[in-house]
Amino acid sequence: KTPRSWSQSPAKQNENEKAINYLTTFSKLIRTILQNSDKREITLYDEIATCKLYTQLESMRFADKFSYTFSIDETIDLKLLMVPALIIQPFIENAIWHGIMPKEDGGCVNITIKRTDDNVLCIIDDNGIGRETSKQNKFKSDSHESKGVHLTQSRIDLDNLINQRHASLEIIDKKDEDGSSTGTKVILTFKEY
C-alpha cells in the first residue's frame, strides 16, 4: 500500500475497490461484445459468458434492486452449440430494465439452460411487472419493445434459413390466479446437433 492509501478511510477504500471491480467487469463486457460483434454466430458458452458479465455489471449498479441466478445443465456442451451472437442478453436486459426496475421492491431474474430431447432451452424468467404494465408506464413506448422482439425474431428466422437450425422464440406473460401479472418468461429453443 502507498502512504496515500494508508490515510484513506476504510469506507473510501471500499468505494475505490467497488469502482475498480465495476470498471474491470465493464471493460471485460465491452471487450467480449466487440470480439463477437462481427460474428454471425458464437458458441452458447461465449453467449452465456457475455450474459453473466452483463448481469454481474447491472447487479453491481443496482445491488439492492434485483437478484439473479444462472442454472446450467452440466450435461450440455456449451462450446459445441452455436447460437446467433447476442441473442439472449437483450432479454435479460429487458427483464431487468422493464420488468424489475419499475417494481418498488425489486425482483429476480433466473436464467436457465436445459436440455429437452434434442433441444436446448434458454429460459429468461423474471418476476417483474410484466409486459402489459411495462407498456403502460410513461417511460416506456410500445414501439421500443415490439421493435426489439421483432428484430430478434427476424434474426432467428434468418439464422434458421441459413443454418436450418429450427430455433424458436416464445414469450409468456405470467399471471396469477386473479389474472394479475407476475412477470415474463422468454424461451429460446435451439436444436442440438
Region locations from a protein language model:
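Two-component histidine phosphotransfer core
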Residues: 1-168, 172, 178
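Hydrophobic core positions in the C-terminal catalytic ATP-binding module
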Residues: 109, 176, 182-190
